[in-house]
Amino acid sequence: MLFRYFVFVFLVLVGCQQNSKKVKTVAHVCTPTQGRFSTSTTTTSRQKFEVNKEGMVLIPGGTFSMGGDGDKAWPDEYPKHEVVIDSFWMDVHEVTNAEFATFVEETGYVTTAEKDVDWEALKKELPPGTAKPDDSQLAPASLVFVPTPRSVSLHDVRQWWQWRQGANWRQPEGPGSSIDGKENHPVVHVSWFDAIAFCEWAGKRLPTEAEWEYASRGGLTNAVYAWGNEN
């Protein structure tokens, strides 16, 4: 499967400049982690400026129970455990198409979904012995969300994600689509590496998994959703 080659995210950035000692200090922003995500990436020129907190909100620090404890949680969400979070700044909205376009225009950056697939790099992410697909299957592509006509099992993502050649942030639904008139929509078809490149340019960083879950819970305790629980 080619699905593992891409990590799709909505870019929601965390500020790295602080005006309070209680706000979490980030020594280095957007430094690629080693190991699982280690790879060579295109270097972009980093802007030198103070992070403008306009459009951001301060998330007060606190303690919360991270992870799942119900039958709908994924295996890697267990066990539920207490986590202490320092205060941090976070964008109110996801990064928009217009903001990402500015980044691309100023740096010449090319996203993962727009690049030809490097089989030698890809096969390292696949089970040993995986046969090389036909070259036509190694063309630039991305996963596109396809609504289902009825309720489906949540254990097979292929029922609502379709691998589509030519799909990228400029063409969200594939060839023939565009972001015209959607400049203020969240940018999509962005890999982890694309996100890292963007936040390095912007002088911010991605939230940690704990920060993201803490903020997403909306201040509620042990609620299933940010707006509460549903039957």
Q: Which ranges hold each PLM region?
A:
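Sec-dependent signal peptide recognition
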Residues: 2-8
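C-terminal motif of bacterial Sec signal peptides marking the signal peptidase cleavage site
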Residues: 13-15
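Functional-site microenvironments in short loops/helix caps that host divalent-cation chemistry
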Residues: 23-24, 29, 34, 38, ...
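A short, compositionally biased domain-edge/stem linker segment
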Residues: 35-52
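Extracytoplasmic
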Residues: 51-54, 61, 78-80, 85-87, ...
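A short alpha-helix/helix-coil micro-patch that ends at or immediately precedes a cysteine
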Residues: 95, 99-110, 191-203
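Bacterial signal peptide processing site
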Residues: 17-19
